[in-house]
Amino acid sequence: IQEVYVMDMDGNNIHCLTHHNDAAMSNRYIARPQKMTYVSQGETLNGWVLLPMDYDPSQKYPAVFDIHGGPRAAYGESFFHEMQVWASEGYFVFFTNIRGSDGRGDAFADIRGLYGDVDYKNLMDFTDAVLQHFPTIDPDRICETGGSYGGFMTNWIIGHTDRFCCAVSQRSISNWISKSFMSDIGPYFNPDQCGASSPFAFDTLWEHSPLKYAENAKTPTLFIHSDQDHRCPLPEGMQMMQALALKGIETRMCIFHGETHELSRSGKPKHRIRRLTEITNWFNKHAK
């Protein structure tokens, strides 16, 4: 539950007026985000890292890299329940606002025609920076996940690198061509974001589709989709999962019946619990 704060107009003297969460949080580990900056493609970008519970600097730890959706969205120093769960499970958790994110103006957020290019490079540079700043992270035990645009990037990443020990692709995009004719926003959003002239510009749409590069994938990947998701329809995950299965790569799909694109935020409580359990179990299987 959100607390109520007051502060001066200059942002100083912040005071919390309510304490709704004190009892619930008193016996739980709450990781505090550590902000870091890094340089990628000539720009200074922001990221954050959560340390695992009972952190011991003499030990090596697994990690989770969580990519936000949008791409016009933004992370901050806020409470993210799933990230806190993973930190309590003994993982470092790191996340960042790459090119395409909100919060730094339209020019920064506009990556139309650049999906899979500058954003991918930013994500890899951030991973390198995190490993440099936190040498207790085991580079062979980094898990990666994301939903919506973050699911697109997850699918893109597994087709372009095998540096992550496992991945979880949620409500994702794998094929801009099929999505153009199945998604509620496909006919106009997809060509606009891919820099294509129309939904029939198949060559351009295919160039930006993770499915094109799936034959390069080696990463064990869990796919999570809702069967009532009209934004990123179920077949987007099924195509990518089938491609991995045909290559003999370990893969699994969890379909949540009756849920929508909003499963992780406003789905039925039992489904939200099951979703997070499936993700965490996948991480534990491959990183512990």
Question: Across the structure, where does each feature detected by a protein language model lie?
Answer:
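Structural motif
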Residues: I1-V6
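Cap/lid segment of the alpha/beta-hydrolase catalytic domain
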Residues: G11-N12, T18-D140, G147, K179-F181, ...
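Low-complexity, intrinsically disordered regions enriched in charged/polar residues
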Residues: D8-G11, P199
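Active-site-proximal cap/loop segments of hydrolase catalytic domains
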Residues: F95-K288
